């Protein structure tokens, strides 16, 4: 069984359904976490927009 670690960006805009965008796919957890750590610096939350990131694990 092979695991894939997929990093998603979640964007929530006021009045619009939140949506997720795949921004990276990795074979190893360490690589996904390094990428996520860098992207977390771009996380923000204000009155109109909330931007966050998360990792989803998928089995092949």
Regions found by a protein language model. Give the residues of each.
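A short, exposed loop/beta-hairpin motif centered on an aromatic-Gly-Thr core
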Residues: 17-30, 34, 54
């Amino acid at each position: 069984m092979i695991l894939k670690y997929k990093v998603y960006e979640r964007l929530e805009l006021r009045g619009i359904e939140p949506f997720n965008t795949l921004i990276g796919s990795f074979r190893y957890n360490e690589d996904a976490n390094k990428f996520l750590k860098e992207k977390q610096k771009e996380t923000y939350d204000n009155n109109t927009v909330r931007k966050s990131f998360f990792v989803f694990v998928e089995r092949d």
